[in-house]
Amino acid sequence: MRAIAILLAVVATIFASLHGVSAIIAVNAEPASSIDSASTHLNFQRRLRQTGDASDEERGNTWFSAKIAKLIEQRKINAMMTKLTKGKSKDEVSKVKQAFQDNVLDELKALVEKGFAPDSFKTALEKLRPGNKGGEDLVAYFTAYWDTFHKAKKLSGVRKQKKRVPHAADV
């Protein structure tokens, strides 16, 4: 009988300790999992903040005001275009537009043939009319042309090849 009581006490102790350990693990695991989830959230927030800095709001306002200025400028251009095209048919308008584009491309080609690059064109405009604000638009337009056409020619490798003079060994 004593052996059974001792055996029962040992089993109860083992059962209680196993149940107690699992209860302790469960109690400790719950806050740990919430801490882990909170830390992943904080890491996510930290990563988001790494891309920005304190002047984000200032940049955002500048970006927005620049967009508004472009929209206002576009509306001015649209108003000017409606004045120019008022009373004309679509064919006449497209002819005027095409003639303008052809003339602009010819002028830009002539600038490149004269040896102008975007930097030299900008300095030439500044020497011609110092403090001219309208020249910035011309420089931007010429730079876009330069990047599109002139650099593309260099990248494609289209160059005038010299005629090869045959050697006596080739004949």
From Swiss-Prot:
Tell me where the sequence motif RxLR-dEER sits in this chain: 46-59
Annotated signal peptide: 1-23
Its annotated compartments are: Secreted; Host cell
Q: What induces it?
A: Expression is induced during host plant infection.
UniProt keyword annotation of Nucleotide-binding present: no
The UniProt keywords, alphabetically, are: Secreted, Signal, Virulence
What Gene Ontology terms describe where this protein resides (cellular component)?
extracellular region; host cell
Does the record carry Signal as a key word?
yes
The entry's free-text remark on domains says: The RxLR-dEER motif acts to carry the protein into the host cell cytoplasm through binding to cell surface phosphatidylinositol-3-phosphate.
Q: State the similarity comment.
A: Belongs to the RxLR effector family.
Its biological function? Effector that is involved in host plant infection. Contributes to virulence during the early infection stage, by inhibiting plant defense responses induced by both PAMP-triggered immunity (PTI) and effector-triggered immunity (ETI).
- Designated name of the protein: RxLR effector protein CRE7
From which source organism is this entry? Phytophthora infestans (strain T30-4) (Potato late blight agent)
